[in-house]
């Protein structure tokens, strides 16, 4: 897959990014280089390789799954402009 100048300008327009002609030409080369690298990565044989979440072997810390209300409701609504008990009051926006 390769990117042409029209594609770069179209993507920039969709992203609402102002790109000059010189920048678009430079980005065309950069994006084609990136896509070439991604194509190289997709050709690597990874059969038998376990997926990793980190480059360092580690085990995630686990904690007990305990249901609790956190006892923070009053603190959470303390700075709200309007509240009733432990609920936020907001103006009606849909008729």
Swiss-Prot record:
GO terms for biological process: glutaminyl-tRNAGln biosynthesis via transamidation; regulation of translational fidelity; translation. GO terms for molecular function: asparaginyl-tRNA synthase (glutamine-hydrolyzing) activity; ATP binding; glutaminyl-tRNA synthase (glutamine-hydrolyzing) activity. InterPro entries: Asp/Glu-ADT_sf_sub_c, GatC. Keywords: ATP-binding, Ligase, Nucleotide-binding, Protein biosynthesis. It is an enzyme of class 6 (ligase). Its EC number is 6.3.5.-. It comes from the Bacteria. It catalyses: L-glutamyl-tRNA(Gln) + L-glutamine + ATP + H2O = L-glutaminyl-tRNA(Gln) + L-glutamate + ADP + phosphate + H(+); L-aspartyl-tRNA(Asn) + L-glutamine + ATP + H2O = L-asparaginyl-tRNA(Asn) + L-glutamate + ADP + phosphate + 2 H(+). Allows the formation of correctly charged Asn-tRNA(Asn) or Gln-tRNA(Gln) through the transamidation of misacylated Asp-tRNA(Asn) or Glu-tRNA(Gln) in organisms which lack either or both of asparaginyl-tRNA or glutaminyl-tRNA synthetases. The reaction takes place in the presence of glutamine and ATP through an activated phospho-Asp-tRNA(Asn) or phospho-Glu-tRNA(Gln). Heterotrimer of A, B and C subunits. Belongs to the GatC family. This is Aspartyl/glutamyl-tRNA(Asn/Gln) amidotransferase subunit C. It comes from Sinorhizobium fredii (strain NBRC 101917 / NGR234). The gene is gatC.
């Amino acid at each position: 897959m390769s990117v042409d100048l029209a594609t770069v300008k179209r993507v920039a327009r969709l992203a609402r990014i102002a790109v000059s002609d010189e920048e678009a030409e430079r980005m065309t080369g950069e994006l084609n280089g990136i896509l070439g690298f991604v194509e190289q990565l997709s050709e690597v044989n990874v059969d038998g390789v376990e997926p990793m979440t980190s480059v360092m072997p580690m085990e995630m810390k686990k904690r007990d799954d305990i249901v609790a209300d956190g006892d923070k409701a009053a603190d959470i609504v303390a700075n709200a402009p309007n509240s009733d008990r432990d609920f936020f009051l907001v103006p009606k926006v849909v008729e």
